[in-house]
């Protein structure tokens, strides 16, 4: 689960964020920021306990709650958008 990942990962910044991206964060805490493209700058301001995940074909921004992610997965499956999973 995302909560397990958040709890397990060390190396959080001073705001308690997990950042695996070229990023500039301001007034952001408890969030997970991931971007696969090292040449893309991710700018985040004012988020709390959120996920920002940028992959090859999907940008996802949502609360860092396991239920939110599960709901997104169910919605994508129901909409026949499985290629984005």
Which role does the model predict for each range below?
Residues 2-85:
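Left-handed beta-helix
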């Amino acid at each position: 689960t995302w909560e397990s990942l958040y709890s397990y990962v060390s190396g959080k910044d001073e705001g308690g964020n997990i950042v695996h991206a070229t990023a500039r964060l301001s007034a952001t805490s408890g969030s997970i920021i991931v971007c696969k493209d090292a040449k893309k700058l991710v700018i985040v301001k004012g988020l709390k306990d959120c996920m920002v995940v940028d992959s090859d074909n999907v940008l996802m921004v949502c609360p860092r709650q396991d239920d939110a992610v599960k709901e997104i997965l169910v919605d994508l499956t129901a909409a026949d958008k499985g290629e984005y999973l």
